[in-house]
Structure formats: C-alpha cells, structure tokens
Curated annotation (Swiss-Prot):
Keyword list, A-Z: Hydrolase, Magnesium, Manganese, Metal-binding, Protein phosphatase
PROSITE patterns per the UniProt record, alphabetical: PPM_1, PPM_2
Cofactor(s), by name: Mg(2+); Mn(2+)
EC number: 3.1.3.16
Amino-acid positions noted as binding Mn(2+) 1 in the UniProt annotation, renumbered to this chain: D89, G90
GO MF terms, alphabetically ordered: metal ion binding; protein serine/threonine phosphatase activity
Protein origin, superkingdom: Eukaryota
Taxonomic source organism: Arabidopsis thaliana (Mouse-ear cress)
Cofactor note: Binds 2 magnesium or manganese ions per subunit.
Residue ranges of every copy of the PPM-type phosphatase domain listed in the record: 58-358
Matching SMART domains: PP2Cc (SM00332)
The name this protein goes by in its record: Probable protein phosphatase 2C 42
C-alpha cells in the first residue's frame, strides 16, 4: 500500500484523552450542575461521552451512526493554545472527514506557532486551505488507484476559543448555536455559523454572482436545490470533481461529471469565519452536524440543554432528534432503535453533537495557567 493510502486511511481515533485536572470547571453557566465527569460508552449505534472537562469548563459529546460506514468525525482539543472543537460531516464516503480530523488541527497548531500562538481569522483560514491542499494531493496521487476519491468531501465546522474570543469557521451546513442568558433568567438561541447550502436563497445568489455565465449553476432536482444539480453544499474540503477539471472526467461515475468545460471551481474551500467576543451571559455552545438540525430547531436544542443536567447533554439532543425522526415517519422510537445502520439512513443521517459549557473565569486565565501543550484530546469513535 502506498504511503498516501496509509496516510489517508489512518484512523481518526485516539484513546480517550487525559483531561485537564480542573475542579472548578463545574461552576460555569449553562445547564444543570455537572456533578463530576462521566465516561464514554455505547448504546447500539450511539457513542457518547456524557461529560468531560476541557480547560474552560465542561463538554458533552455524542454521535450516532446511520450510514453503513460512519461519515461523521469530531474532536475536542484543549490546552495552552486555547480550545479547538471540530465537527466534520462527510459525504460520498468517510475518507475526507477522517483526513480532516487527522490534519486540520495539526495545521492550525503549526500555523499559529508562526505568530507565537496568536489566533486570528487568517490563522484559521490558512489551516483550512493547507488541509484542502493536502487532501487534493492525495486525490491526485491516487487518481489511478481510487478515482472516486475525487467525489468524496466533508463539511467542516470549527470553533476556536482563544482568550476571550470565540472564532467560528464553517464550510457546508453544520451549525453552532449559542445559548445566551437573558436579563430575566431565560435563554435565547443565537446561531453563530453560516450554512453554505443551495437551499438557502442567499447561497443561490452568491453562486449566481460567482458564475454569471452559467444559468445551470444551481438546479432544483429531487425536491432540493443543488450546485450543478449534483450536491447541496457549496463549500467543503474535498469534492475535487467540482473544483478541478482534471478530476471531472472518466473513470468517475457519470452522475458526477459536468457536461460543459469547468472554467472555475464550482465549490470553495474558503470558510466563512466569525469572531464573537465572549460575554458572561454566554452560557454554552451546541456544535452539531446537519442531521441534528433537520429535526430540532435552534430554540428547542437550547431549551433541552438548559433544562437538564449537563451530563449527557449531547446524547439527550440526539435522542430528541431521533424521537422527532420517528414521529415524522409515524413510528415508535423503540422501533427506530431496532433498525440497523445503512437502512437507518432512510430515517435520519449520521448525527454528531458537541455541547461546550463556558466557564468564563477559566477561559480568561486557562491559556496562562495551562502548563501542558495539549491537556485534552478527544476524538469520536471511528466506527460503532
């Protein structure tokens, strides 16, 4: 097996990492009292870590598999550099999401080291582009062996907490929602990410502006809007068949091939990046792949987290989405649970959720007091 092939298929998985020894982490806002940390476990196709500690508070993490091969990957990394949260929702196969899980954070660390660890929008954007170029190189090297690798891609949602600022970078249609305390004690749901999906009218106009000479840049097909009638998302890592003409030809499947010459990339790997100064009323963040948001509103998700203990928050959100998926199909949740992967995809997508609770005292000083290079490194299981 070639070195590139070994590199591509290396497992996006580590033993579930040691966490920062932080007894104060339970005192932050949002959710119920933490009551300590809970371990990871499995329940059928569901993997979860009920409660963990990062250097700015607590987090909860869960993923459920629906596809024959799990296409979602995710990670939480925390240390003296701040905190990095990633959700990678693959499509066409698992390879791009696994590659991003293995490489995006490493590129982020290498690039931020050039500026003594200072994090900026440029730092994050460069990390995305370096990851895209790395995956493109593998697609090129393996073109003769695995041409369909050119049709694999992944959405990317990244949150970086650096000092008292949250950076959110997004490609595709995963979403992060902030639970923010109001003056009267309630919580509001504030979406912080941009979704690059052709079903969004703003994205259709963006694509038309970028491709004024192509009346077929977005096509309504099978009940949804798609870029060139093929794919719903307009930005991703991977999907080289939509970005480089040398990968849009035989032997990839006819359904992926564009009839007319490709004058410019049809999709982008440049993320939309938002910077949000953290406020004491910012209680928690819900990072999730679009499989969750197909079934839960932003407000409902925030309500669920707010009204229950922290432990198991991510798992609780996934189960709420599954209950809703079952209701839509007029079936019982207990019957949905009996359906095996692959067939399960007809009822819901792979779903990844990471809930990050914000302890503002710890966030303010954590990057100073942390003495280890990386004190938390958690990645979701590769398969269930």
């Amino acid at each position: 097996m070639s070195g590139s092939l070994m590199n591509l298929f290396s497992l996006c998985f580590k033993p579930f990492g040691h966490v920062c020894d932080n007894s104060e982490a339970g005192s932050g806002g949002g959710g119920g009292v933490s009551g300590g940390t809970g371990g990871e476990g499995k329940d059928g196709l569901l993997w979860f870590r009920d409660l963990g500690k990062y250097c700015g508070g607590d987090f909860s993490m869960a993923v459920i598999q629906a596809n024959q091969v799990l296409e979602d990957q995710s990670q939480v990394e925390s240390g003296n550099f701040g905190t990095f949260v990633g959700v990678y929702d693959g499509h066409g196969g698992p390879e791009a999401a696994r590659y991003v899980c293995d490489h995006l954070f490493n590129h982020f660390r290498e690039i931020s080291a050039e500026t003594q660890g200072v994090v900026t929008r440029e730092t994050i954007e460069r990390a995305f582009h370096a990851t895209e170029e790395g995956f493109a190189s593998i697609v090129s090297e393996l073109w003769q062996e695995i041409p369909n690798l050119a049709t694999v891609g992944t959405c990317c949602l990244v949150g970086v907490i650096y000092q008292n600022t949250l950076f959110v970078a997004s490609l595709g249609d995963s979403r992060v929602v902030l639970g923010k305390k109001g003056n009267c004690g309630g919580l509001s749901a504030i979406q912080l990410s941009t979704e690059h999906n052709a079903n969004n009218e703003d994205i259709r106009w963006e694509l038309k502006d970028l491709h004024p000479d192509d009346p077929q840049i977005v096509v309504f097909r099978h009940g949804v809007w798609r870029v060139k009638g093929i794919i719903q998302v307009s930005r991703s890592i991977g999907d080289m068949y939509m970005k480089r003409p040398e990968f849009n030809k035989e032997p990839i499947s006819q359904k992926f091939r564009i009839a007319e010459p490709m004058k410019r990339p049809l999709m982008s790997a440049t993320p939309t990046i938002l910077s949000h100064p953290l406020h004491p009323n910012d209680s928690f963040l819900i990072f999730a792949s679009d499989g969750l948001w197909e079934h839960l509103t932003n407000e409902k998700a925030v309500e669920i987290v707010h009204n229950h203990p922290r432990a198991g928050s991510a798992k609780r959100l996934i189960k709420a989405a599954l209950h809703e998926a079952a209701r839509k199909r007029e079936m019982r949740y207990s019957d949905l649970r009996k359906i095996d992967k692959k067939v399960r995809r007809h009822f819901h997508d792979d779903i990844t959720v990471i809930v990050v609770f914000l302890n503002h005292d710890l966030i303010s000083r954590g990057h100073i007091n942390s003495t280890q290079d990386t004190t938390v490194s958690i990645r979701s299981a590769l398969e269930h």
